[in-house]
Amino acid sequence: LYWDDGTFNVYAIYPRMDKVLSLDSQPFSVALDQNTPKTATSLGGYEASDLLFASQKSVTASDSPVSLLFHHIMSKLRIRLIKGEDFEGELPTKAKVYIHSTFTSATVDLRQGIVTYNPNVARQSIIAHQDDETSYSAIVVPQNITTRMPFLEVEVNGVSYFYESRFNYKPGVENLVNLI
């Protein structure tokens, strides 16, 4: 990288974006199926949905590297299935977990590292990534769901169990929901 005289602002985002259309409102969407595994040539649905941002302002030319501290700008939801007192049998090790009623499209301000959901696109459902036998995670666009509506669905052997709630997905925050 050639440095000219003067000061510069350095911005970095992960994962890499192939086409940057706007620094102020770059379109971005989380994967609807975040349980899709990564391959030799592409990220899995979960990893491709997470955005990390770093910036360093007023950098001048030098031989030293520019230090960048990355932070998450999306929200993370973790769901744990816990065996309750009245549950008979064993917890399923292969369930399908859906996060419903979320905006999955957003714009990103690549100068500020701020994600804003796109209210002009219909709410959708996300298939969560299975972390282990009873834990699931999904990356969600920051948003506040103020109306009580279907929130989580756990599908086991063709039977669905629903949980309704309001929810506030904050940027850079991991939320944990225990389903008993």
Question: Language-model segments: which ranges?
Answer:
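Short, low-hydrophobicity acidic/polar segments
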Residues: L1-L91, S135, T147-R148, E153-Y161, ...
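Residues in well-ordered beta-strands of folded domains
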Residues: I13, Y98, I139
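Short, ordered, surface-exposed loop/turn motifs in non-cytosolic proteins
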Residues: D86-A122
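Short, hydrophobic beta-strand segments
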Residues: S137-N144
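Intrinsically disordered/low-complexity terminal segments and short unstructured peptides
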Residues: A106, V115, E133, I145-T146
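Short amphipathic beta-strand/extended segments with alternating polar/hydrophobic composition
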Residues: L110, I127, F162-N168
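Extended, solvent-exposed segments with strong compositional bias
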Residues: Y117-E133
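Broad, structure-driven detector of short, well-ordered beta-strand segments within folded domains
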Residues: I127-A128, V177-L179
